[in-house]
Amino acid sequence: MSDLKCAQTLVLAAERDFELVQLMLEHNGGADEVFGFHVQQAVEKLLKAWLAIRGESYPLTHDLEQLFEVLAQGGVELGAFRSLSDYTPFAVVHRYEALGPQEPPMDRAQAASRTASLLARVKEFLAIPDRS
């Protein structure tokens, strides 16, 4: 599969996860663990798509910080997107274990907003012929 086709496939998959994030936000429903899992999945797929667009291989990992680091090493300015790495535990730990009572409340609106911004940014790259 070409890098561009791979990126398009990953973005479509990320959009499916993000659709659930939006529905859960709109209806204030579902467990935080499920919400966080779909944020993590959307972000992971978007970061891998971004790397594919750049023609770079990406590690097979759920670790968002590792994916952000690969982009940063390539000179990509990540700004506030990098805070989304906080959702890594939702792919591996909180997918099976509930959040503890000591966990701070999740800011779903902020997570959804940052994920939406990341989605828009990656989709922009797919529409631009020069993907440098």
Give each language-model segment a name:
Residues M1-S132:
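Terminal alpha-helical segments
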